[in-house]
């Protein structure tokens, strides 16, 4: 079953799904600054565009482009700077 999610006044939208017990979402972020909290560990892969991120326990910002991934610990948070509309895949690692 597909689950549609919408955040930040519709500027971030995703569709959640399960495949063989693995949970994931695919979505698009409009340009903007965002902060997300995580319940479970997750891996974010940039499908198209770029995401500049700052993990909760780091001072530095890192930019990830098409095909690149980063992981975020569970029970944590991360900040995002999105300069152009960007598509992503989020895989939940628990």
UniProtKB/Swiss-Prot annotation:
Disulfide bonds: none
Assigned keywords, A-Z: Glycosyltransferase, Transferase
Enzyme Commission number(s): 2.4.2.1, 2.4.2.2
SUPFAM superfamilies registered for this protein in UniProt: RmlC-like cupins
Superkingdom in the source lineage: Bacteria
Pfam families tied to this protein: Ppnp
Catalytic reaction(s) noted: a purine D-ribonucleoside + phosphate = a purine nucleobase + alpha-D-ribose 1-phosphate; adenosine + phosphate = alpha-D-ribose 1-phosphate + adenine; cytidine + phosphate = cytosine + alpha-D-ribose 1-phosphate; guanosine + phosphate = alpha-D-ribose 1-phosphate + guanine
GO molecular function: guanosine phosphorylase activity; purine-nucleoside phosphorylase activity; thymidine phosphorylase activity; uridine phosphorylase activity
Gene Ontology CC annotation, any one: cytosol
Functional summary from the UniProt entry: Catalyzes the phosphorolysis of diverse nucleosides, yielding D-ribose 1-phosphate and the respective free bases. Can use uridine, adenosine, guanosine, cytidine, thymidine, inosine and xanthosine as substrates. Also catalyzes the reverse reactions.
Annotated family: Belongs to the nucleoside phosphorylase PpnP family.
Protein name: Pyrimidine/purine nucleoside phosphorylase
Organism of origin: Aeromonas salmonicida (strain A449)
Lineage of origin: Bacteria, Pseudomonadati, Pseudomonadota, Gammaproteobacteria, Aeromonadales
This protein's encoding gene: ppnP
């Amino acid at each position: 079953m597909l689950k549609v999610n919408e955040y930040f006044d519709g500027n971030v939208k995703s569709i959640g799904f399960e495949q063989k017990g693995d949970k994931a979402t695919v979505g698009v972020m409009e340009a903007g600054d965002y902060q997300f909290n995580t319940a479970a560990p997750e891996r974010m892969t940039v499908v198209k565009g770029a995401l500049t991120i700052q993990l909760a326990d780091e001072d530095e910002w890192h930019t990830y482009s098409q095909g690149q991934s980063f992981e975020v610990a569970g029970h944590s948070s991360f900040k995002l700077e999105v300069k152009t509309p960007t598509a992503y895949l989020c895989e939940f690692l628990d």
